[in-house]
């Protein structure tokens, strides 16, 4: 999967660990995962286990 920046990772991608996984399904994150970015990326969701 493609990594994405969770809100808990910090304000920007520079120098921060990207702990989320970009999820492209319109229904949201898979079972047992949660959306870790409040406003969401441009496409899909940023999900974390």
From Swiss-Prot:
It comes from the Eukaryota. Keywords: Cardiotoxin, Disulfide bond, Ion channel impairing toxin, Nematocyst, Neurotoxin, Secreted, Toxin, Voltage-gated sodium channel impairing toxin. Belongs to the sea anemone sodium channel inhibitory toxin family. Type I subfamily. The record marks 12, 49 as: Key residue for high affinity and preferential inhibition of sodium cardiac channels versus neuronal channels. It comes from Anthopleura xanthogrammica. GO terms for cellular component: extracellular region; nematocyst. Its main location: secreted. Disulfide bonds join 4-46, 6-36, 29-47. Pfam families: Toxin_4. This is Delta-actitoxin-Axm1a. GO terms for biological process: regulation of signal transduction. It is found in: Secreted; Nematocyst. One of its GO terms (molecular function) is toxin activity.
